[in-house]
UniProtKB/Swiss-Prot annotation:
Protein name stated in the entry: RNA-directed RNA polymerase VP2
Gene name per UniProt: S2
Subunit organization: Interacts with VP6.
UniProt-listed Pfam families: CPV_RdRP_C, CPV_RdRP_N, CPV_RdRP_pol_dom
GO molecular function: hydrolase activity; nucleotide binding; RNA binding; RNA-directed RNA polymerase activity
GO BP, one annotated term: viral genome replication
InterPro entries noted in UniProt: RdRP_C, RdRP_N, RNA-dir_pol_reovirus
Length: 1225
């Protein structure tokens, strides 16, 4: 018997609370959908469901809208495959120039047959198209596409308490083709298999489309009636070629919001200071200047020409009905959801080559510089521009050369190269002979740059390797993104990458010398858009957002020479003695104007840059299974270089800032207040009179055009875009459609469910301030976890199978498989208890209210709820903390927790199955081979520094401060190589050992398992009582009540209320964290749980005299030491009591991340202050409680109530140095 799949009628659907009964009901229903294909089919296509065709309801802004479901005949009765859709050139050497379609055309899936002679071009083409339809459409992120769709539909059913809504009708019309699903994912074959050959080729992608539209509905971006507009538009695009049409119309479908803001006339907006603080609000006129508004007519005509008529009608209606800035924001978010289905756009590399990498000559060619000095190989050593755009850029960049050279001289470049190498793919594979030479283990590890460099370390100082790499073709690697066409990047091998490393090192020094570059310190929160918030709230500004179209393809040899000129100028002033195969030496050079050659001392950096500049423009090739080796024409800038982004950033700022200097020399004033550049994205802010700002903006655009770039500058007085972040009049309009919850570039098996949940949590954090309804997002994430991330399958030795099953089945649901006598092991699936989603080291997801034994409920946890060990407090909350305080009890309610499944979830976490896999794999890695490889690399870099680091770490260990190898500089190379070795898949032999060891652990743990407790659990025993004192909201509550600061911060919302209570970001704390993060090269990812900080802090608190050895061990220079010492001192303000929690910057975004912000909102009895650390600890309690319970907060003062055991614990630990882990990741 299948369980009742009527999720929408459950008690949980009505109350959004878990009673003991309703929890079991949801657990069983979601487990059924996770594990039973028949149940999924019945749930999605229940014959009793009503089918809607006409629907009326409210749109995003509350206006009535009517819509009719329309599924084109081209989708339900697709055409037969037509070979002429992918025409070949006459000589069959490639696709015909200007072919119509770059992506998968819509046709009947079964009509793509391959009847051509094997080995012919047509046979190979059809085999490739078959892979495009079956393999490249498979993009699932968390589970197979039908489970993901079930998660979305389940959340909609429960949220709206009905199955009667349009998206379900689309699902049934599109995918219900009998008792079987029309297609399914086959992980073993790594492809989609069609059961029904009559369906459209593109139909699997529409499962993801439905998931994305459902996500937009759940998160409040689309209403049900607007979902019809979205689905109708997507289906209209798919009549011919879905992705081609989507790419064609996406821009024009979103380009109307400036006109809508212009029409609004006046808005009240927040005013920001330059220190990321709201200091007031003002009325602003949103009317755009004539040179902007003059473009609106042409845009309207283009929309009418290109867009599906119903979608264009929706936009015209939005223009007509938008009366406020909030109206425009809501309609704009809806239109973005209607033009991006969140899928990663994939096609054959051969079809996308022209659009991705074919050289483009835009506007005009750049003149070349005059060569002033060259070497015997006729490579330029020094060059200069006398006129043109090159001269403009050089006039600005030349002012940095002396300081950049000084900084470059202070770098050990061989060591920097070793640190630059990662565990990513090395751009080539070992030949069979090379594999035999290095041995099987090392050959298996060599799929990483660091190991490949170690294998060929003996050749590092030989120039021949560089010349050899220059002759080898550069391989293309395809990359897919959401909402952008497929790209092709250059898969450079280590030697070719090395060639671009010195120009990268030189170029990136500029980042620290001016503030033009947006590279570097990205905090992940509103700090990143601080300048945009400030300038869009100012008067008399013109905001320019520039995107350079196809920049890599537009950088010609001549354009690249602008950067080469700067790099060679810097290199000529360096004194670098050695770098790879280059040694500083006297060389024969030729100078312009001198008849005889001269001998000149040329340092290593100069030699390296000269060779790179002379050989930086070679063609790329792609090994096509259809056409053989396809060579791209000369001229495209290889996008996989070390300095790709740096080149673009430095070049563009040279052109823009150089133009500013030229204008000054021509007697024209500068209106350029600031610029920010990252790669091919440019933000310019002009301030002054309307005419002056416009003339300067046009002048800059002209310079970029003269440099060979096609630029589209969006000018506005209201809005600015940089790095896909849109800010409008001091408010953030985040692009929710850019976050793909359900798809990824490459589908991969979910090995670690806890890591998959971390990924889900991170994606939801990204979405949180981009959506209007975080509560809907919470439910969506819950059902994703419950249906997509509950099943874990492992291989169990046949001899241990039954005993393993018997031990675990007491605590969780298991699925047994029939044993095959031909194999030693059999699969067993563990169905995780639903409560695993809410556990620390489990899912760490915000919990819905759980019923306690006395009938009361725990808090409904908001999406701002902290994660990490703090989630352990839920166990005590369910066990009733208030009662524990009253009865002075410390015991968990084991019986109730077991009934909910927390005991089984805790057991699963304690078993640590996934770490067992790593443990077994680690045992098989030869430490001798790892050491040999690391030693071969150490000879190339700072060998003495590494030995010194290891000695310092050894001395610390003797004094009781053992450091982990991953932070000791002297073991860094070993750790990288070890990581590469661990990335290989476990063998059958290893699986058997894992099974045996797991059986031993299970037998030990499951005899009488109870959730373990620790003395530190006392820190969770606090409560808050409401008092009748209404708390004042902070002043910016009023300033943000007119225009929504973000989509989830409308007046009266949880986001707005949390901001009104706690305030905004602590700038000084963020800057400090960014400084510390910069030491690790992990800007926005730094956490106080970072091992460098964590282990250093312990030494700082307990044995400060050992800090010098600590700094030597981690190889921290004077600057890094100062940063860490400041961070240690700042962090010590939190006291010595350990209380772990994790909040990500994106999860808070605008909200304060400083626990002190909660101090004014809570009354703490004086008797609780039993040590100097109490104030900081109690602020953390208060802060985390307000974030967690913001939905039920009534705006009144709270009183803290503590358990006697907590006070005793704080009193007893206040003098010992325990790391306070208020983690911010």
């Amino acid at each position: 018997m299948l369980p009742n799949t009527e999720l929408h009628t459950t008690e949980f659907s009505k109350t959004r609370k878990f009673t003991r009964q309703s929890f079991k009901q949801i657990e069983q229903l979601t487990a059924s959908l996770a594990n039973d294909r028949v149940a999924r089919h019945k749930f999605l296509f229940n014959n009793s469901l009503p089918l809607i065709s006409d629907y009326s309801g409210e749109d995003s802004n509350g206006h009535q809208l009517q819509a009719t479901i329309k599924i084109p005949d081209e989708i339900t009765n697709p055409k037969e495959y037509d070979p002429s859709d992918y025409p070949l050139a006459e000589d069959e050497s490639f696709f015909k120039q200007g072919h119509k379609y770059d992506y998968l055309v819509t046709f009947r899936a079964g009509s793509l047959t391959n009847t051509y002679e094997p080995k012919t071009k047509m046979y190979k083409l059809h085999a490739a198209l078959d892979r495009l339809m079956h393999v490249k459409q498979r993009k699932s992120r968390f589970a197979d596409l039908w489970r993901e769709l079930c998660a979305v539909i389940a959340s909609l059913d429960v949220w709206y308490q009905t199955t009667n809504y349009p998206l379900r009708t689309y699902v049934k019309f599109l995918f219900h083709k009998g008792d079987e699903f029309p297609f399914y994912e086959s992980p073993s074959q790594d492809k989609i298999v069609f059961n029904d050959k009559s369906v459209a080729s593109i139909l699997p992608t529409f499962v993801y489309t439905c998931c994305q539209v459902g996500t937009a509905i759940m998160s409040g971006i689309l209403t049900h009636v607007e979902s019809i507009a979205a689905m109708n538009h997507f289906l209209h695009c798919a009549k011919d070629s879905y992705i081609d049409e989507k790419l064609k119309v996406k821009g024009i479908g979103r380009s109307w919001y400036q006109e809508a803001l212009h029409n609004v006339g006046q808005v009240t907006v927040p005013v920001w200071s330059q220190f990321n603080e709201i200091i007031g609000h003002r009325t602003k006129n949103t009317s755009e200047p004539h040179f902007v508004s003059a473009t609106f007519t042409a845009l309207r005509a283009k929309r009418a020409e290109l867009l599906y008529s119903e979608f264009n009608d929706y936009i015209n209606r939005a223009l007509r009905l938008s009366k406020t800035q909030n109206d425009v924001a809501n309609y704009y978010a809806a239109c973005r959801a209607m033009t991006n289905d969140g899928t990663f756009l994939a096609t054959l590399t051969e079809l996308s080559l022209d659009a991705a990498v074919f050289p483009r000559i835009e506007q005009r060619l750049v003149t070349r510089p005059a060569v002033l000095m060259s070497n015997a190989r006729h490579e330029s050593l020094r060059q200069k521009y006398t006129d043109g755009v090159g001269s403009i850029a050089q006039s600005y960049l030349s002012s940095f050369t002396d300081e950049v050279a000084r900084r470059v001289n202070g770098i050990h470049h061989d060591e920097a190269w070793l640190n630059f190498l990662t565990t990513s793919s090395p751009g080539r594979k070992l030949t069979e002979i090379e594999k035999l030479e290095v041995g099987g283990d090392v050959a298996a590890w060599s799929n990483s740059r660091i190991v490949m460099q170690a294998v060929f370390a003996r050749e590092y100082r030989t120039p021949e390797r560089i010349f050899k790499s220059l002759k080898a073709p550069i391989k293309l690697v395809e990359r897919q993104q959401s909402d952008r066409r497929q790209r092709a990047i250059s898969g450079l091998d280590n030697d070719r990458l090395f060639l671009s490393f010195m120009p990268y090192t030189i170029g990136k020094q500029i980042y620290d010398l001016n503030d033009n570059a947006a590279q570097g310190k990205q905090a992940g929160n509103a700090f990143d858009i601080g300048e945009m918030l400030y300038w869009t709230s100012q008067r008399n500004v013109l905001l320019s957002s520039i995107d350079v179209a196809g920049m890599d393809a537009s950088v010609t040899t001549n354009t690249k020479d602008i950067y080469n000129t700067f790099v060679l100028d810097v290199a000529s002033k360096c004194t670098v003695p050695r770098f790879g195969p280059y040694y500083a030496k006297n060389m024969e050079v030729f100078e312009v104007g001198k008849r005889q050659s001269q001998v000149k001392y040329v340092n290593a950096a100069w030699q390296a840059c000269a060779l790179e500049a002379a050989n930086s423009q070679t063609s790329t090739s792609y090994e096509s299974e259809i056409f053989g080796q396809v060579k791209n024409a000369e001229g495209t800038y290889p996008s996989g270089r070390a300095d790709t982004s740096t080149h673009h950033t430095v070049l563009l700022q040279g052109l823009v800032r150089g133009n500013e200097l030229k204008r000054a020399s021509d007697g024209k004033n500068s209106c350029l207040a600031t610029i920010k550049i990252l790669g091919d994205d440019i933000m310019e802010i002009f301030q002054g009179s309307q005419d002056d700002t416009h003339h300067h903006a046009v002048s800059n655009a002209n310079v970029l055009n003269e440099s060979g770039f096609a630029t589209t500058a969006e000018l506005s007085q209201n809005s600015i875009v940089l790095l896909q972040q849109l800010v409008v009049n001091g408010t953030f309009w985040g692009f929710a459609d850019r976050i793909s919850l359900w798809t990824r570039e490459d589908t991969k098996d979910i090995g670690r469910l806890n890591l998959a949940m971390m990924e889900l949590n991170a994606l939801l954090d990204d979405l949180l301030f981009r959506v209007r309804r975080p509560e809907g997002l919470k439910m969506l994430g819950f059902f994703c976890g419950a249906i997509c991330l509950r099943r874990f399958t492992l291989s169990v030795d046949n001899n241990l199978y039954d005993s393993t099953y018997n031990s675990l089945s007491k605590y969780m649901t298991l699925i047994k498989y029939d044993k095959n006598p031909d194999f030693d092991s059999t699969l067993m699936s563990l169905i995780l208890p639903l409560t695993w989603l809410f556990m620390p080291r489990g899912g760490e997801y915000p919990a819905y209210p759980f019923e306690r034994r006395d009938g009361t409920f725990t808090e409904d946890e908001s999406m701002f709820t902290a994660r990490g060990a703090y989630k352990r407090r839920l166990l005590y909350d369910i066990s009733n903390i208030r009662e524990m305080i009253q009865q002075n009890s410390l015991a968990l309610d084991d019986e109730l927790l077991h009934e909910y499944g927390f005991t089984g979830a805790s057991l699963l976490i304690d078993l640590n199955i996934l770490d067992l896999i790593d443990e077994v794999k680690k045992e098989d890695i030869s430490p001798v081979k790892v050491s040999e490889l690391a030693t071969s690399l150490e000879q190339l870099g700072k060998l003495g520094e590494r030995e010194k680091s290891r000695r310092a770490a050894s001395d610390l260990k003797v004094r009781g401060h053992a450091l982990s190898n991953d932070i000791v500089y002297g073991y860094g190379l070993q750790e990288k190589i070890q990581k590469s070795a661990m990335a290989t898949k476990e063998t059958t032999v290893q699986s058997k050992r894992i099974s045996l060891r797991l059986h031993e652990v299970i037998a030990t743990k499951t005899r009488d398992y109870r959730i373990p407790t620790t003395p530190a659990d006392a820190l969770h025993l606090y409560e808050f009582e409401g008092e009748e004192v209404v708390m004042d909201l902070l002043p910016h509550a009023k300033h943000t009540s007119y225009s929504n600061l973000a989509y989830n911060m409308s007046f009266g919302s949880d986001g707005w209320f949390a901001f009104a209570l706690l305030g905004g970001l602590d700038r000084s704390a963020i800057l400090l964290r960014l400084d510390v993060a910069s030491i690790r090269g992990n800007y926005h990812k730094f956490s106080y749980d970072d091992p460098v900080f964590k282990q250093g802090y312990k030494i700082y608190k307990s044995d400060a005299t050992s800090l010098d050895d600590f700094f030597i061990a981690i190889s921290a220079g004077p600057k890094e030491q100062g940063i860490l010492l400041r961070a240690f001192a700042y962090y010590s303000l939190y006291g010595n009591v350990e209380y772990h929690y994790v909040l990500s910057p994106r999860q808070l975004f605008f909200l304060s991340d400083n626990p002190v912000s909660a101090e004014r909102l809570v009354r703490i009895p004086p008797s609780y202050y039993v040590s100097t650390q109490c104030r900081a600890l109690y602020n953390i309690f208060s802060y985390l409680h307000i974030l967690r319970s913001i939905t039920s907060h009534e705006g009144k003062r709270l009183k803290m109530v503590l358990h006697a055991g907590l006070i005793a614990y704080v009193r007893g630990t206040s003098s010992s140095a325990i790391l306070p882990e208020a983690d911010t990741v």
